[in-house]
């Protein structure tokens, strides 16, 4: 039986990803004004009603309305298909972080318990799974396409045969204007599918599924409710490699759901870059209020070129895995999280955990 693995990605106009972008825009804005702030933000979007809730501890007062409008403007009101300035209604319920949690975080402990994973593979220059990168590349091409027939909501899914090194099926669902000419629409979409595959040295001989229901006019938050933190596969490795129990977006880096996931990725990538293994998965585990991780493990799936004992000793000797050590090494208080809230947190140039 062939080893066919499937990865997925969503566009920045998908309602869940809109919520992630708003949450991370709030995190970035607050940290730019207060490096000591604690931020945990969740968003829910349905039709033109947005609800922002969470815990924020800071003396700075963010302009939530302006932040939200900036996010929608970046996505594009025309692509969203509705006038957000006239229609958008925002509800806000934000309180301070629990003092019981702050007791542990203030002394440098983890902001919560949890497990986090990082993954890397040498199959692409980005050290990411090839079907994930192809799906992501397709949606980036779609986002930048000048045609007005394309709307903001879209999803892509790529099935890849690791035995033959070929894509077997490329699926996409792309929201479009109601007056679209189906033949023109399909031709452009299929051309972008092939172009995305060619970017990674693959041919265009695969099954192409474009809007299998036949129509995708009603989309975004008018078709589906959006919620922060629901697209973990899209945010991480597309479904290859395990994921931790917590989402990344909407959290300041004292939350190890975010910071430890970035460090685990860096460690896995460093191991692959050093030639110690062809692919690597790192697990980190933390207890709330405890400074050191309670667990560190490395899995190389039999691809290691050094012993696992050597690799584990390398990790132990090379990385400060305390929350504050991670924040300092990766400069996480200065990251613009708007850069990672859509099209993935990993495999992008210019991010400290990718360097």
For each of these PLM feature ranges, what is it?
Residues 3, 46, 279, 283-355:
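Internal helix-turn-beta structural module
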Residues 37-41, 150-160, 206-210, 276-287:
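A short glycine-rich, hydrophobically flanked beta-strand micro-motif that places a catalytic Asp/Glu
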Residues 40-58, 288-292:
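Short, charge-patterned binding micro-sites
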Residues 1-40, 45-46:
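N-terminal, positively charged regions that mediate nucleic acid binding
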Residues 179-271:
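Glycine-rich anion/phosphate-binding loop at the beta-strand->alpha-helix junction
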Residues 2, 46, 121-122, 237-243:
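Short connector loops/turns at beta-strand edges and beta->alpha or beta->beta junctions
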Residues 12-31, 120-140, 253-275:
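Alpha-helical support elements that line or immediately flank enzyme active sites
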Residues 6-9, 66, 70-219, 339-342, ...:
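Glycine-rich, mobile lid/loop segments that gate access to catalytic sites or pores
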